[in-house]
């Protein structure tokens, strides 16, 4: 008797699934950064995954697909220094002090400094190793409304935030959507806090 051929894989349902399909590493993980400390922990966890997979197991960066997803209260880590300087609410909301000045951060600290002093635990270092960053579009719209206030233009503020993402970041409809789609695409899920 002949076995029936396996069903053909369904084509990607949308742009997000198509993008996830381009991430070809056999070792796949998404770090779900939800709370303020989770943004920093997600960066550190991604660094540890890349570092120790390579050093202890010999896994090459090309064989690893890593996503750090900033959503909910960790979303501001997806914006560049200009937005952190313009909107001091990010530092107060996330309770982030600049380790150089010991004052509320007026810059996106992980764009410049290594988390907890660990070499390679920064956004540029992760990017150089092929890690991807996603930024929650739903949280961005919510934050834009808060930043604009009742008399401001939330739509214009949202456009400004989306035009000022950290280098290489990708906006996604919602962080919960990329988390689900990544798991569907074979990514292991890690809650970073």
For each predicted feature, which ranges?
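Secreted/extracellular ectodomain signature
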Residues: 2-193
């Amino acid at each position: 008797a002949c076995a029936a051929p396996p069903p053909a894989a369904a084509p990607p349902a949308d742009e997000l699934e198509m993008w996830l399909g381009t991430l070809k590493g056999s070792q796949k993980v998404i770090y779900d950064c939800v709370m303020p400390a989770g943004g920093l922990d997600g960066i550190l966890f991604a660094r540890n995954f890349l570092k120790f997979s390579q050093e202890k197991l010999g896994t090459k960066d090309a064989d690893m697909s890593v996503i750090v997803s900033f959503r909910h209260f960790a979303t501001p880590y997806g914006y560049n220094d200009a937005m952190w300087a313009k909107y001091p609410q990010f530092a107060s909301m996330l309770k982030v002090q600049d380790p150089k000045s010991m004052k509320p951060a007026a810059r996106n600290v992980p764009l410049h400094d290594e988390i907890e002093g660990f070499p390679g635990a920064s956004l540029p270092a992760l990017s150089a190793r092929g890690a991807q960053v996603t930024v929650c579009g739903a949280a961005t719209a919510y934050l834009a409304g808060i930043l604009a206030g009742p008399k401001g233009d939330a739509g214009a503020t949202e456009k400004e935030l989306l035009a000022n993402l950290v280098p290489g970041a990708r906006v996604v409809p919602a962080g919960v959507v990329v988390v689900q789609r990544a798991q569907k695409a074979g990514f292991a899920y890690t809650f970073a806090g």
